[in-house]
Amino acid sequence: MAPDRQRTKRLLHLSPKGGSGKSGLSRLLMSAAIRDGLRAIGLDADPQGTFAGWMSKRERYRKKAPEVPYAEVRVAAFADAARALDEIAADLVVVDTPTALENDPVATKALILASDLVLIPCQPLDDDVRSVKTIMLTVQELGRPAYFVLNKVKRTVKEAESSRRELGKVGPVIAASIPDSIQIARAMAHGLGVVETNGTGADDVSSVWAEAKRLLAMA
């Protein structure tokens, strides 16, 4: 049975901080959703096109490994992204966004209101933590559920827990975090997710996805 557009869940990745990991999280969670057998479609609203480029790499990889499931990532201008969502029927749409959200507050608001869950990735660094607090408050003011996701976490660095506590003063934080793993980067370089290669970080990504899926009422 084809997915019902009215039942499509929309997962938005949002952050005003460059390098926070929006595109990476989009790729990781979309591949986890596909592995779960969901009809997941990506929407790349970032002019850098990293998410869409990942799909192209995946298609090249599938030529030698056709057993790898197909992944579809559509492209839309940020100003048109909320309208583009209305044209997608799937189990899940994963949305990647640009950094300069302040350049188009109307589009930012429209995307937030159109989403079922907003994830705000953040590296465990003081500058990053400070920069993402405002967007969490914005999402909360608009009445949409939002969670921080700690990203590129080094296991032996104590700053991760202090960052978690600081973020928790503003909004909820996903219990699991994305580690700083070269195997995550290597998987994405081939258009894959680490859950598909079972590399270091696969269990962490699976845990983040499991929590997101629960919050989306898809579990």
What do the predicted segments below correspond to?
Residues 2-20, 27-105, 109-110, 188-189:
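P-loop/Walker-type NTP enzyme "switch/lid" segment
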Residues 42, 95, 120, 148-150:
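Structural beta-sheet core signal
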Residues 90, 115-116, 171:
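Short, well-ordered alpha-helix to beta-strand connector turns
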Residues 104-125:
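Inter-motif core of Ras-like GTPase G domains
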Residues 129-151:
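Conserved C-terminal guanine-recognition region of P-loop GTPase G domains, centered on the G4
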Residues 154-156, 164-195:
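Beta-strand-loop-alpha "switch" segments that mediate conformational coupling across diverse proteins
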Residues 193-219:
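NTP-binding/hydrolysis catalytic cores, primarily Walker-type P-loop NTPases
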